[in-house]
């Protein structure tokens, strides 16, 4: 790739005061900057302690300097790191000294961008750096580290290699018709295609769990008025986040609360009670509730266990299942178990539906069952050494690849159209390439790296 030859510099540590602060320099002038600031030639990859001086020889600070000649560095270029005291004034003086020596101020994420452009890491690994820095739980940090070490990229590369092999076979048959390869008769293409589709489905499922751990799961609390939805929100949040009264329709708008369960991020949304109403304000609240239901990763359908309607909770609101047609993402909460006499428990039906009996007001064991259930929904129990971090962008690319393979299979089996299959295979490979950066527009790269910290 065409990598810019300018030398860049930035403060690489977080803003504020600390024991240690780092100024990072990358580019062809890094070695010259090291000699000017330290006053001597630095031995590569060794720590050198001494004063950092300005152009007049005045000491700015003292600390450790590290010099990494390219290509054996993070960016693939010559890199200098100055580790001094972590005061903002001291660090700014060091940075200004580097700029005086010919560097320019780095853009956000430009160090990682140069590492990507110099093939030191791929795009998924570069994004994992930001994910590791921003991780909100230990599990999310571990997943981001595995992605940084290439776990996700290797899965994508393996899929890409299989697609390339399949494309070679298909396109050879198209280009050399005298070989008379019958795609359907020999079954080879279909077997290879189905193998790739199965593996892609597994990667997509695991990436979805990785994205939930990174971004957090949106949990919508829905149900009839006075079912105890706001009490459940307060119980999960551990504070009085919502007003609770005996008056039906107290909650008239969506209320959002961001919480963590064992370090795992959840975005909990309390909604207006679902019912027919003539009140204009409450009607708007119901419409917003239905919209939130449609956007949820998980729905907690709360019913009052003491009410007759609890026997058939999914008949409470006709539009409910229309708004969220996937029943697998609905957890039934039988609330007020302290009044109904229901035992506190979690039950899973033969079709996979989960029902939890609890008392939101009393908390206790029932609330703990719900917390464990939500952790399981996020993949907390399924994480392993093969887990990795993923982003919504990655999921879109994987879905695009999956759709292309499904379309290509239909073209082959229904019409025997090898040419159309070849095009679908090409599109699937391109979609996978967008994950690692093999196929990425400049606009996409700009958006990704601009979200990084300066100095990263």
UniProtKB/Swiss-Prot annotation:
Location in the cell: Cytoplasm
Annotated TrmE-type G domain residues: 216-379
Key word Hydrolase present: yes
UniProt xrefs under PROSITE patterns: G_TRME
Residues where GTP binds: 226-231, 245-251, 270-273, 335-338, 359-361
Annotated keywords: Cytoplasm, GTP-binding, Hydrolase, Magnesium, Metal-binding, Nucleotide-binding, Potassium, tRNA processing
BP-aspect Gene Ontology terms: tRNA methylation; tRNA wobble uridine modification
A molecular function (GO) term: metal ion binding
Coiled coil regions, renumbered to chain: none
Residues at which Mg(2+) binds: 230, 251
Enzyme class name: hydrolase
Cofactor(s) listed in the protein's UniProt record: K(+)
Pfam families hit by this protein: MMR_HSR1, MnmE_helical, TrmE_N
Entry keyword annotation includes Hydrolase: yes
Superkingdom of source: Bacteria
Function, as annotated: Exhibits a very high intrinsic GTPase hydrolysis rate. Involved in the addition of a carboxymethylaminomethyl (cmnm) group at the wobble position (U34) of certain tRNAs, forming tRNA-cmnm(5)s(2)U34.
Name used for this protein in its record: tRNA modification GTPase MnmE
Lineage of the species this protein comes from: Bacteria, Pseudomonadati, Pseudomonadota, Gammaproteobacteria, Pseudomonadales
């Amino acid at each position: 790739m065409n990598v810019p030859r300018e030398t860049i510099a930035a403060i690489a540590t977080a803003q504020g005061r600390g024991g240690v602060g780092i100024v990072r320099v990358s580019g062809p002038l890094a070695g010259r900057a090291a000699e000017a600031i330290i006053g001597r030639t630095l031995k590569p990859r060794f720590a050198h302690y001494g004063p950092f001086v300005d152009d007049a020889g005045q000491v700015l600070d003292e600390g450790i300097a590290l010099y990494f000649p390219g290509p054996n560095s993070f960016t693939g270029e010559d890199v200098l790191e100055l580790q001094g005291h972590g005061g903002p004034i001291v660090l700014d003086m060091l940075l200004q000294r580097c700029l005086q020596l010919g560097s320019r101020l780095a853009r956000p994420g430009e160090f990682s961008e140069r590492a990507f452009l110099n093939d030191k890491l791929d795009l998924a690994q570069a994004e994992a750096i930001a994910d590791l820095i921003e991780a909100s739980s230990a599990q999310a940090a571990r997943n981001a580290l595995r992605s940084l070490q290439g776990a996700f990229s290797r899965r994508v590369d393996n899929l890409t290699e299989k697609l390339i092999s399949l494309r070679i076979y298909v396109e050879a048959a198209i280009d050399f018709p005298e070989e008379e390869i019958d795609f359907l008769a020999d079954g080879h293409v279909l077997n290879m295609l189905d193998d790739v589709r199965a593996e892609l489905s597994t990667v997509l499922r695991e990436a979805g769990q990785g994205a939930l751990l990174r971004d957090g799961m949106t949990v919508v609390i829905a149900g009839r008025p006075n079912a105890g939805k706001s009490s459940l929100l307060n119980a999960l949040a551990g504070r009085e986040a919502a007003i609770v009264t005996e008056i039906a329709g107290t909650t008239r708008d969506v209320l959002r609360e961001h919480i963590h369960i064992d370090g795992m991020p959840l975005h909990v949304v309390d909604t207006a009670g679902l019912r027919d109403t003539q009140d204009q304000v409450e009607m708007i609240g119901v419409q917003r509730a239905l919209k939130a239901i449609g956007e949820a990763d998980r729905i907690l359908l709360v019913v009052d266990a003491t009410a007759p309607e609890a026997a058939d909770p999914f008949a409470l609101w006709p539009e409910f299942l229309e708004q969220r047609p996937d029943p697998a993402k609905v957890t039934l909460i039988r609330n007020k178990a302290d009044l109904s006499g229901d035992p506190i428990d979690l039950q899973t039906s033969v079709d996979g539906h989960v029902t939890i009996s609890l008392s939101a007001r009393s908390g206790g064991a029932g609330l703990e069952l719900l917390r464990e259930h939500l952790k399981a929904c996020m993949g907390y129990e399924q994480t392993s050494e093969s887990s990795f971090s993923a982003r919504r962008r990655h999921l879109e690319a994987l879905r695009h690849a999956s759709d292309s393979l499904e379309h290509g299979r239909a073209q082959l089996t229904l019409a025997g159209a090898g040419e159309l299959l070849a095009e679908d295979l090409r599109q699937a490979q391109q979609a996978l390439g967008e994950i690692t950066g093999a196929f990425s527009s400049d606009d996409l790269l700009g958006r990704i790296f601009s979200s990084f910290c300066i100095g990263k």
